[in-house]
Amino acid sequence: MEFIDLARNRFSERSFSSAPLEEEKLYKILEAGRIAPTACNNQPQRFYVLKSKEALAKAAKLTYTYNAPVVILVCYVNAEAWHNPRDGFCSGDMDASIAASSMMFEAEDLGVHSIWLRGFDAGSVHQVFSLPDGTVPSLMLALGYPGEKSAPHKLHTMREPMEEFVVEL
């Protein structure tokens, strides 16, 4: 499948089955995040894999996880992220997002569905999972196979025309 078709067909899964995710597929998904581009190749991204009942229950109290069998907590280490000397911009959240996007599309290519989650308080996530100081939670990526009610959201195919996004200067 061409990438554009993969990107067009992928949707945020809101109905996961209880089927476990194979370790081989999880490894490939994590590898896609590991090799993702980062600012200055600093590689500040960190992945915390939540798959025990206890860890998944903690995540579900912090944000809606749709009963996914695996959730990857995507973080970055602030001290390892690139900081723009001109304006102080920190690349960490952007680097973590690029890694998560790579994992999301690798998952889709493997037949694994996903949903990007950010409806949580980062301080609470840091505390609940006892993250190291300087590690910043960026997002969670829920992974698994589609459940019985799996379907794209009604807004999935609604896209603005190209002219709304592109300006030639």
Ranges and model annotations:
Residues 3-20, 139-169:
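C-terminal helix-cap and adjacent tail motif
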Residues 15-16, 46, 113-116:
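Short catalytic-loop micro-motif centered on adjacent basic/acidic residues
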Residues 25-99:
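Glycine/small-residue-rich phosphate/adenosyl-binding loop
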Residues 33-34, 72, 80, 87-128, ...:
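Small-aliphatic-rich amphipathic alpha-helix that forms the alpha element of a beta-alpha
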Residues 52-53, 75-77, 120, 143-145, ...:
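Fold-independent oxyanion-binding glycine-rich loops
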Residues 66-70, 112, 133-137:
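Short coil/turn connectors at secondary-structure junctions
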Residues 127-132, 153-154:
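Short proline/glycine-enriched turn/loop segments at secondary-structure junctions
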